Amino acid sequence: MTAERLLSYFGESRFVPELRSRSKDGVLGEMARVLADEGEIGDPALLLEMIRRRESLGSTGLGKGVAVPHGRSTAATDTRIVFALSKKGVDFGALDNEPCRLFFLIVAPYEDRKHEYLPLLGKIVEVVSDEAVRERLLQVDSFGAFTQTIREAFGE
Amino acid sequence: MSDRVQRLAQLQDLELMIREVEDPASKMKEEALGFSVEGLAQLQNARSRLLKQIPKQDLRAYQRIRRKYDRAVVPVMNRICLGCFQALPTSVTRNVSEAGPLPICENCGRILYWL
Ligand SMILES: [Zn+2]
């Protein structure tokens, strides 16, 4: 997967430089609303229910301040990623009990004809496994800075 | 959004999640990425609770369509059924009464969920 391909799932309207919410449930709601506000999702309630249920199987807080909530929903028509930051950090029930600061919400349609969902999840996990990339992502203040950081992570 | 269609969409999402948790290959792929995927029993409990809230005739329709297609409930965008990608006739509307028929695509027979 190239940087351009990965970046095609993100968007300026799906970039949240600072989350208002201070709770896990608040963060999930705030990020789901981003998709609803840009008309990508008909019904945020249906999406939110699916995301919360996925969290009940185990927190998607992977540790090192990163959370990747994800799932497939009837309410989605295309695969989309919302990227959000919380400088103060949010208790997400992460495996290492550290507060989460970097959030990637991945939502895919029920039918994934291009089989892009799991490889995408894998790519995000791979990108944020690099400490230097995490440090730089924490500093981004615009969507342009975000895309620049991702391109650099790919060595471009 | 009709509550009746909404509940069927909820059921469909839940059944999809159950299927993924039950599928060893898909579960292993997520676990290999560092995610924990436990709690099949609570998903099944949630499904049982949801089933009780769905009118019998809606459930029968949903299950009948599920035997034919992977998805029984499909989104509608710009008056296109995203199950079969055909345009819907103007007679099909998003308004569903409590007792009336479910909105169904005339072409493929799936239940329509307006985005
Ligand atoms: Zn159809």
Provide a role label for each language-model segment.
Chain A
Residues M1-E156:
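Cytosolic covalent-transfer regions centered on His/Cys nucleophiles
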